[in-house]
Amino acid sequence: MTISNSVAPAQFSAIKPVQSDSAASMLCRLVAGACVVLSASAALADDMKMPMNGKEMNWGPAPPAFPKGAQVTVLSGDPFKDGPYVLRLKMPAGYKLPAHNHPTQENVTVISGNFHIGMGDKLDEKKGIELTTGGYGEAPAKMNHFAWTTSTTVVQVHGQGPFAIAYVDPTDDPSKK
């Protein structure tokens, strides 16, 4: 058995083995536990997608509600239907997303690059915070926020569909141009 360097062996000294009245009863408990795990796994399998690496993701242009230049790939669910979804948005350096909000909470994790996000009614680069690779942010439903990039950036967005975006200033909506 290997013990991770991050866990001190002394921490394991307090763990006592489970006492069993017989090897047969222990075997029965293990088999029962395995059956529970397998049946739960089978139920979840229909909802799971195959694991994939970044190179296997299919990218395409973001919907017209996003400024030109962004690409998107949907990893799970359908953002435009009721239910959970996960997508990734790839933006070039200098990309700007004017102040907007969503009817549901938006959760964003930075996969790569530098993603700047701020709260307010107008994009103001002095009011934002920079999130770097691994950074996380969330915008509650209907909270006005804006974003921009300083390098090519990929963010993962997850939330509850249907996804919608409403620009604070309707003239900022690229789908109306």
Which role fits each region the language model picked out?
Residues 1-26:
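N-terminal secretory signal peptides that target proteins for export/translocation
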Residues 32-33, 43:
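Cleavable N-terminal signal peptides
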Residues 50-52, 126-127, 146-177:
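Double-stranded beta-helix
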Residues 92-95, 102-122:
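Glycine- and acidic-residue-biased ligand/ion/polar-headgroup-sensing regions
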Residues 121-142:
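Short acidic-glycine-tyrosine-enriched beta hairpin
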